[in-house]
Regions:
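N-terminal lobe/hinge region of extracytoplasmic solute-binding protein
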Residues: 71-122, 153, 222
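Detector for C-terminal structural segments
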Residues: 92-95, 233-238, 338-371, 421-431, ...
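Gly/Pro-rich hinge or "lid" segments in bacterial periplasmic/extracellular proteins
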Residues: 105-109, 198-265, 271-273, 380-386, ...
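Aromatic- and charge-enriched surface segment that lines or borders ligand/interaction sites
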Residues: 116-161, 177, 183, 325-327
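Surface-exposed binding/hinge segments that line
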Residues: 130, 165-209, 226-233
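Extracellular/periplasmic solute-recognition and catalytic clefts
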Residues: 155, 159, 173-175, 230-241, ...
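Ligand-site clamp/hinge motif
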Residues: 218, 248-297, 427-431, 437-441, ...
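Structural transition elements
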Residues: 227, 320, 355-397, 417-424
Length: 561
């Protein structure tokens, strides 16, 4: 799994989480201008033609040649799509140079991109793609079926140990039928395949470049996309220049040729607090906003603020099921009632979030608010005390919670460092449990060390945040043995397996509802909230569009100044 779990479990954790709105966010605004028109007028009984100045309303025409400057939350270790699951790296790869066979439209349906069409076998275990002809990688080599096979085979190769492997499900082989036909064969139907392939897992890079650069390819990536890498100054910036031979085949991008902007500059700005200044000085064009600074930009005529509430993330507590008492569903239920979700929304996220009861993000297919309400556990500390008592935990006269052996209860809750609002959520959890007489020690570490530590047993609970636009995220987290090899087998396993092999969208959504109920009935986690995605755009940025997976579509972007 990953620093950001993947493209389908997609983008996890970090501050720069992309919005998932699918409509253009910043279209050119009509403005009043004075022009000279030739008009026909009547003068003393005769018709004459003359020129006069008139005031009209017009929309500025898009112009090219701009340099677009955006923020990078961190300097990627590599831009090799096969070897990374970093959110930051995935965003750079997907947005600027590496395209896929399919993309998802604003309604959440797969559409052809580098593929022209596809056919699915009757038993749904073979998918055959017809590829577009005449497409070139930016190094001048051909995109074809052999290139598709080369890229996917790298992910399938156990020796490569690609973190993308889990997103190919039961895929057994990729076969070249002819130069522009490629066939994927599965052991069993795999419902998340198309959405996984629309993300970085499905990136098709130049085999020639990958072979030429070998282990250094991640610093010299080549795709069929609208931009090509120019310069990479480690720790400072990455610069891309326009691919002048580019062809755009997506129908959600107006410009079908080379992108309007000449260059893309990605500035490495890791500090959350620096984003405000970078926006105010015009150093960057767009900035994703932490909850603390949203109010600063709302109402400022120099910016447009976009707030997306239909998000695909959930912040939740996970248990170390290998340790008592977290192997006891009664204790997990008690903890769930002990958490004041609204306090976390208000105190940790300044109100820019929504309470969550379901383990599935509210923006995902299959999410049902009725299920979340019926099976959710609203804040009720008295009920939490009663459940703890049923599990053998009691409060003594001093209000200290004692375990069944009569010892004071003390737990360690861990998470990752560097994300202010996650840390504040931890503090709410700590305070809620302290109110019940439970001592909680908080511990954070940088992402890599934190995630690695979860394979061990030196923790009791951890606060996690996942993002994904597909319900298969539930499989990745909860299907035993779980993403950190701690999850026990349970009735949810068979349901999750069925959801992953159910290809009909309606039937799959019903299956996903069953999975949510099973996970909630077994108290497999404590969902707390889903935070909104918020960003500010300089008011002169035009046609800034985010797609279904949260990726920028740079081809139409231009600066109206």
């Amino acid at each position: 799994m990953n620093k950001q779990f993947s493209v389908i479990f997609a983008s996890l954790i970090l501050i720069g989480l992309l919005a998932s709105s699918c409509a253009p966010q910043s279209q050119a605004t009509p403005e009043t201008i004075t022009v000279i028109q030739t008009v026909v007028v009547e003068k003393e009984g005769e018709t004459v033609v003359e020129e006069r100045q008139v005031v009209v309303t017009a929309t500025p025409e898009p112009k090219g040649g701009d340099t677009l400057v955006f923020r990078l939350e961190e300097d990627p270790e590599t831009l090799n799509h096969v070897l990374t699951n970093s959110l930051t790296a995935n965003n750079v790869i997907a947005q600027y140079f590496c395209e896929r066979l399919v993309y998802y439209d604003g309604q959440g349906n797969p559409q052809p991109w580098l593929a022209e069409s596809w056919e699915v076998s009757e038993d749904q275990t073979q998918i055959t793609f017809k590829l577009r002809q005449g497409v070139k990688f930016s190094d001048g080599t051909d995109f074809n079926a052999a290139a598709v096979k080369y890229n996917i085979d790298l992910i399938l190769d156990p020796a490569v140990a690609s973190p993308k492997l889990s997103y190919l499900g039961s895929l057994q082989s990729v076969d070249v039928v002819d130069d522009y036909t490629v066939q994927f064969t599965f052991e069993e139907p795999y419902a998340p395949f198309f959405i996984n392939m629309s993300g970085v897992t499905g990136c098709i890079a130049s085999p020639t470049a990958m072979q030429q650069w070998g282990e250094e390819y991640g610093r010299h990536p080549v795709g069929t996309g609208p931009y090509k890498l120019d310069e990479w100054i480690p720790g400072s910036q990455i610069t891309f220049s326009r691919n002048d031979n580019y062809q755009q085949f997506r129908t959600d991008v107006v410009n079908t040729g080379a992108p309007l902007a000449e260059k893309i500059v990605l500035l490495v700005i890791p500090e959350e607090g620096t984003v405000q200044a970078a926006l105010e000085t015009g150093e960057i064009l767009v900035g994703y906003l932490a909850a603390d600074i949203v109010a600063r930009f709302v109402g400022d005529p120099n910016f447009r603020v976009v707030i997306d509430k239909n998000v695909a993330n959930v912040v939740f507590l996970e248990f170390n099921f290998k340790k008592a008492p977290f192997d006891d569903p009664k204790v997990r239920e008690a903890i769930s009632y002990a958490i004041d979700r609204q306090a976390a929304v208000n105190a940790a996220w300044n109100g820019y979030a929504e309470i969550a009861y379901s383990p599935l993000p509210l923006g995902d297919p299959g999410f049902d608010p009725a299920v979340a309400t019926e099976y959710g556990t609203p804040y009720d500390p008295e009920k939490a005390k009663a459940l703890f008592a049923e599990a053998g935990f009691i409060q003594n006269a001093e209000g200290v919670m004692l375990d069944p052996a009569g010892q004071p209860v003390s737990w360690k809750v861990t998470s990752y460092a560097g994300f202010t609002h996650i840390n504040r959520t931890l503090e709410v959890v700590q305070a809620n449990l302290k109110d019940l007489g439970i001592e909680v020690t908080l511990e954070t570490a940088e992402w890599g060390a934190f995630y690695e530590s979860l394979l061990g047993d030196d923790w009791d609970m951890e606060l996690m945040r996942w993002t994904d636009r597909d319900p298969s995220i539930l499989n990745g987290i909860y299907r035993s043995p779980g993403h950190r090899e701690k999850t026990p087998e349970g009735p949810y396993d068979a349901i999750l397996d069925r959801c992953n092999t159910t290809m009909d969208p309606t039937e799959r959504n019903e299956c996903v509802k069953e999975a949510q109920i099973s996970l909630m009935e077994n108290f497999m986690s404590v969902p707390i909230l889903s935070n909104w995605s918020m960003y500010a755009v300089q008011n002169y940025v035009r046609d800034y569009t985010i797609d279904y997976l949260g990726y920028l579509l740079p081809g139409d972007v231009w600066l109206d100044k």
